From Swiss-Prot:
Covalent S-S links between cysteines: 37-85
Origin organism lineage: Bacteria, Pseudomonadati, Pseudomonadota, Alphaproteobacteria, Rickettsiales
Keywords associated with the record: ATP-binding, Cell membrane, Disulfide bond, Membrane, Nucleotide-binding, Transmembrane, Transmembrane helix, Transport
Extracellular side: 55-67, 114-147, 206-218, 301-320, 370-379, 460-465
Organism: Rickettsia felis (strain ATCC VR-1525 / URRWXCal2)
Record topology, Cytoplasmic segments: 1-33, 89-92, 169-184, 240-279, 342-348, 401-438, 487-498
Keyword Transmembrane found: yes
Protein name: ADP,ATP carrier protein 1
Membrane topology: Multi-pass membrane protein
Gene from which this protein is expressed: tlcA
Amino acid sequence: MNTPKSDNYLSELRKVIWPIEKYENKKFLPMAFMMFCILLNYSTLRSIKDGFVVTDIGAEAISFLKTYIVLPSAVIAMVIYVKLCDILKQENVFYVITSFFLGYFALFAFVLYPYPDLVHPDPETIESLSLAYPNFKWFIRIVGKWSFASFYTMAELWGTMMLSLLFWQFANQITKTDEAKRFYSMFGLLANLALPVTSVIIGYFLHEKTQIVAEHLKFVPLFVIMITSSFLVILTYRWMNRNVLTDPRLYDPALVKEKKAKAKMSLIDSFKMIFTSKYVGYIALLLIAYGISVNLVEGVWKSKVKELYPTKEAYTIYMGKFQFYQGWVAIAFMLIGSNILRKVSWLAAAMITPLMMLITGAAFFAFIFFDSVIAMHLTGILASGPLALAVMIGMIQNVLSKGVKYSLFDATKNMAYIPLDKDLRVKGQAAVEVIGGRFGKSGGAIIQSTFFILFPAFGFVEATPYFASIFFVIVILWIYAVKGLNKEYQVLVNKTEK
């Protein structure tokens, strides 16, 4: 017979493991399912897009796509989104954008992917143009495989539009503050399970023993899963609008108050803010350094993955495994990150990310630069060759850098805003989002693409020493910024405590 004490213990344990009340499951579970489907597509797209571009165009093309196609496309997509919001209800905007992605996936799956010779220009023409105009050869090669470039762009936009914008806007609109404290952490845990699930799906359908479709159409089942997943997102969203938003226990427009708009700053105002406030400048430097250092290692790593796994199928299966490890490591860091922040100083917690990046980056580049020496010493000790070891260390570096991003890096960055006065906190955060966000995400790609334009004879093999040098300079600047910010942070914290 259960005692009241044991009942209380079980009740508290349930709240820790599953902090959702029974009646809230009607709201929470469909939202979690929507997020799972969106992230299932996102992680599948991330694996496939690189497989197509890296093996058919070249790893060098990724930096050009990010800089000259994805970035302008994201701006155009946001302009279209704002226009749609002016003329349609929010619910219909969601249907239009999701249906657009669904339609593109269907077009790619059944027209562009199965018939590349019909939609792409003659390869000989592309090659002759590349030789005639070497400084623009990567632009020409991208045009030569334009359908894969469009797929890469749509894959990037899926994450921006469907997850960052539409899902979280819907979640923020219908979730009360007390619900958000319990719902959002659970969303993070459940969402990261989509990554290992993606790995299993990719591994099964692209395995050489799986013979569902013709060999040259191996990716079609994955596209069908993405189309089905997109359709389920639309159905779930519609069901929630009809059944959850009409339930007064779960949604009351009067209680879900309109949130104050974030301070938005122009590019010029953001630069002024960062150059006039040393404190805000340090925070921006953290974000820029993280984005550039990740991109510099990632580009070189993907070129090495292509050497080890030269076919689309093998490359995509490997990237699926990468998603598997990334998902579990992200969950682990989410669970232990808060404990680290409670037990160590801000400086120690903030220093973990750049030091981890420095150590793993140094190991990765060492295996590339000294591959013959390493091969000589490790022959007979390890079954893997230096290329496989370099790829493995590159994967570890990427997994850890993305794992710490959402737990330690973002947490320490956001903690740094707390001691600032309200005006500087709001404006400073807006300035950092504009400068740090833009230059962090595209900085590495701009460096790489500019290098390949100026030195057309270079690929990643020849350019790696230069990118490695830039990487180490950036990480050292990052460590300097953390130390500088810590001094300023401690002064402000001590002031507020007094």
